[in-house]
Design a protein with these regions (language model features):
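Nucleic-acid endo/exonuclease domains
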Residues: 1-95, 99-120
Length: 120
C-alpha cells in the first residue's frame, strides 16, 4: 500500500476539482483522441512528494501543463529539480505551455501519442 501524505492527497483531490482551462482542454482531448490501450491517464496524481498534472502509470509518462509563472527563474529551477527527481524514479516527463494546449492542441496530442507509441 502506498504511503501518501494525507494533506498532499487532499490537495490533489481539490486540484482535480479545480483544473485550469488548459488542463481541462488537454484532459478532454486526451480522453477522446488517444488510443485506449496503454493510455489510462490519471489527473493530479501524487507521485512521491509531487502532484503531477497527468500521469499514465503503465507507460511511466507524466504530462505537465505550465502557465506563465513557470517561466520565472525560481519556478523554472523548482520545475527542473522536480523533473530530475521524477526522471530518476523512472518517469518520462513532457511539459507543454498553456498556450500550446489552447492554440496547438493537435500538435500536443500528436506528441503525446508519438511518445506512447515509441516514435519519440
Amino acid at each position: 500500500m502506498r504511503d501518501i501524505d494525507a494533506a498532499l492527497e487532499k490537495r490533489a483531490r481539490a486540484m482535480r476539482r479545480d483544473m485550469t482551462k488548459a488542463e481541462r482542454r488537454l484532459w478532454r482531448h486526451m480522453r477522446q483522441r488517444l488510443p485506449l490501450e496503454r493510455t489510462h491517464f490519471r489527473r493530479q496524481l501524487v507521485i512521491g512528494a509531487a502532484i503531477v498534472d497527468f500521469a499514465c502509470v503503465a507507460n511511466k509518462l507524466i504530462i505537465e501543463v505550465d502557465g506563465a509563472q513557470h517561466g520565472e527563474d525560481e519556478a523554472r529551477a523548482y520545475d527542473d529539480a522536480r523533473t530530475q527527481a521524477l526522471v530518476a524514479d523512472g518517469w518520462r516527463v513532457l511539459r507543454f505551455w498553456n498556450f500550446q494546449v489552447m492554440d496547438e492542441i493537435d500538435s500536443v496530442i500528436e506528441t503525446i501519442a508519438a511518445v506512447i507509441e515509441g516514435r519519440l
